[in-house]
């Protein structure tokens, strides 16, 4: 028994001796596996210059290098500060540069970058710091530092390359059609601010585009919008750009404006006088209990202005002659007026003998009706109406040619009927003999913003009672 105890004592003493001889403890274990900090070195061009012996351009390219004894460099973080006029320094937030991508591949040019340092004064002092980050995420706790001075940057200049009309209809917010008053500036690297009349300047926006809506303007009237820029050198434009604009906020208090764009005819079949068409549409509106005002483009000498049309919920344009005189065509600004009216939630009806007659050139017509009425650009197809009734979809009254206005036997039918092919949300209501309705003559467009009715076979030529029923349905839809 004593022999066995001696053996155990010997074994215990041997283990104690072995542990002491290895000298292993917890601190040594932690030290053996501790991650060492990476090191960062900045290139000596430009040299560290706290005293301002040299003045550099505000745009500088800096180079650096990082190494890690027990791993590899995953990236860098950098920041800098500029001494402002109050002798105070404000450090930028840290920014990061990756040296290794997600697949473990080295990213080239991660050891250099061109910076633009704010330099609004004749002499500007900066401190730049950069720290390497290793594969374990540990950063150099003593970042490499560079102190240097820059000279004043070039002056800022505010220049617009795109702006809205000097008179425009606005709404409180944008929609899928109306994008607001869009101002686009030339220099994409500058920041921009604005103010309206004598109000406060906005904060600088780091974008080459400023968009304003009706929320920026308390009421209709004339405004001056000022724009200024701050370029990448932190130079601020001392001569802000001025933009004068007449803002119209639509009231829509009136129901309908009837716009006569019919050139005067001689009263023969297919050649109505202006008075004949005027009487037809005025009676049509009165019998449907629609309150309306009249604007005769030929008598007035011009299309109604934005202020006039913005007071109405619906514009009804008719041009029922085979041709149009120059006075009864849309000028470019008239097209813009109609765009703004519709895109700010107005509704429109157009009845015409030919879409093209309303415009000075076909390209204007194609673009307007393709974008606004959502019809294909092949609306130049000319058909002959061989039946005295139009084909139609269910729910709409029959439309039959009025023989007193244009005898159906005249030239074997109603010639030169312009048809078109609706697209998107444009619903074909009346059409000629085609089963798939590609030769539409009357359609209704329903968007989330506005509604539009187009007829390329003048409503004037159809029997009055039938047109009256149709207009009641359309007016109920447009309200």
Q: Whereabouts are the PLM-identified features?
A:
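C-terminal motif of bacterial Sec signal peptides marking the signal peptidase cleavage site
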Residues: 18-21
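Extracellular ligand-binding/catalytic regions of CAZymes and related secreted enzymes
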Residues: 23-26, 373-375, 435-479
């Amino acid at each position: 028994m004593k022999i066995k105890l001696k053996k155990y004592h010997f074994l215990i003493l041997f283990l104690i001796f072995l542990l002491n001889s290895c000298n292993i403890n917890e601190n040594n274990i932690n030290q053996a596996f501790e991650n060492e900090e990476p090191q960062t070195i900045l290139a000596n061009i430009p040299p560290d210059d706290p005293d301002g012996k040299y003045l550099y351009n505000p745009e500088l390219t800096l180079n650096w290098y990082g190494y890690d004894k027990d791993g590899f460099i995953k990236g860098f973080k950098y920041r800098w500060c500029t001494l402002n006029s109050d002798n105070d320094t404000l450090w930028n937030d840290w920014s990061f540069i990756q040296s290794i991508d997600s697949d473990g591949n080295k990213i080239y040019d991660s050891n250099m970058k061109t910076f633009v340092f704010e330099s609004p004064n004749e002499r500007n002092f900066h401190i730049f710091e950069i720290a390497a980050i290793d594969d374990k995420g540990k950063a150099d706790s003593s970042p490499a530092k560079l102190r240097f001075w820059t000279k004043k940057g070039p002056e800022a200049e505010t220049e617009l390359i795109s702006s809205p009309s000097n008179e425009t209809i606005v709404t409180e917010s944008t929609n899928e059609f109306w994008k607001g008053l869009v101002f686009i500036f030339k220099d994409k690297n500058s920041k921009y601010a604005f103010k309206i009349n004598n109000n406060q300047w906005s904060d600088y926006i780091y974008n080459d585009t400023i968009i304003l809506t009706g929320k920026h303007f308390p009421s209709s009237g004339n405004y001056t919008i000022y724009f200024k820029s701050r370029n990448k050198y932190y130079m601020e434009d001392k001569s802000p750009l001025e933009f004068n604009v007449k803002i119209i906020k639509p009231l829509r208090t009136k129901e309908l404006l009837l716009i006569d764009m019919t050139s005067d005819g001689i009263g023969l079949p297919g050649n109505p006088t202006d008075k004949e068409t005027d009487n037809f549409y005025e009676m049509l509106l009165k019998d449907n209990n629609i309150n309306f005002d009249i604007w005769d483009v030929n008598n007035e000498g011009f299309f109604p202005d934005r202020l006039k049309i913005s007071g109405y919920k619906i514009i009804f344009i008719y041009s029922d002659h085979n041709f149009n005189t120059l006075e009864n065509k849309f000028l470019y600004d008239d097209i813009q007026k109609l765009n703004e009216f519709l895109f700010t939630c107005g509704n429109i009806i157009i009845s015409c003998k030919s879409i093209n007659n309303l415009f000075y050139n076909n390209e204007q017509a194609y673009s307007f009706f393709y974008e606004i009425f959502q019809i294909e650009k092949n609306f130049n197809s000319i058909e002959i109406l061989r039946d005295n009734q139009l084909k139609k979809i269910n729910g709409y009254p029959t439309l039959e040619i009025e023989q007193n206005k244009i005898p159906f036997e005249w030239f074997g039918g109603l010639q030169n009927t312009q048809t078109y092919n609706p697209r998107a949300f444009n619903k074909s209501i009346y059409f000629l003999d085609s089963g798939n309705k590609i030769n539409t003559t009357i359609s209704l467009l329903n968007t989330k913003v506005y509604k539009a009715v187009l007829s390329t076979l003048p409503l004037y030529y159809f029997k009055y009672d039938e047109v009256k029923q149709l207009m009641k349905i359309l007016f109920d839809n447009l309200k």
